């Protein structure tokens, strides 16, 4: 059982670098093959040769009939099947370990280069190392991306697993069949005539044979399904690689995000210009602030009142403030215009 535990640890490492279908295949391999075969196989098939009895007393007849009925024990046959089916996965694991060790060496070399002083040569060497690391397809979490040469190795392992499964199923059908008969008729030297041999617990052994047959069929189905998945994935990657690049659309395609255009036509000068409608909420509350010109005019009135109130105290009070008064906007009430005939006549007398 120690060798089986070592093999189980190796296959557990493969699970980290397999597809989802490959992980299901490993679960089927461990739970329904290793555990069932290790726990129930010996108890069911332990009396296979000891309880194989033939109705003859001819020496050696029972042994040759047992060898003809069971060229290889069922348990040993299933163990051999398990080893053959697991071997391609171990080759794939070896490729993964090789890529991981290679990445570790590249990282170590990169750290050594960063410690040097010549920046130009260091940058060139680091760029070369980065290109080599990209070819390894190893992600940041340590898992290997199945691409390139690793994809070929994985595809090859799946193909060989499928071939081994199908081959062992055909071999079991040719050697034993899938039903254990209670009586086996043997005619072989040194038996003097046809001999009837009896198998112990044939129904129990038939159930076990059918169970292992179903497990083998499930494993074969998963391998074929994974093979189709990998082929489709590689074809999609190839099409993406050689297809022209189409940049993503920066603007939304849904026309509902923009409000409908109003039926009213724009007035000049914006009538002939195109403009964008932006989505806005109808219930927007604006703060009650005054317009800038209204606020400036209110500030000026306040300062003007303060200046008039302090006119008597200021030494410059006898000067007129009309020179400093700005012209108010048209939207507000304007100051009274001093246009009288008396003032105009007085100005004429002054010039005379």
UniProtKB/Swiss-Prot annotation:
GO terms for biological process: cell communication. One gap junction consists of a cluster of closely packed pairs of transmembrane channels, the connexons, through which materials of low MW diffuse from one cell to a neighboring cell. PROSITE patterns: CONNEXINS_1, CONNEXINS_2. Residues 340-352 have a biased composition (Polar residues). One of its GO terms (cellular component) is connexin complex. This is Gap junction alpha-4 protein. It is a multi-pass membrane protein. It is found in: Cell membrane; Cell junction, Gap junction. The chain crosses the membrane at residues 24-46, 77-99, 154-176, 209-231. Gene3D superfamilies: Gap junction channel protein cysteine-rich domain. A connexon is composed of a hexamer of connexins.
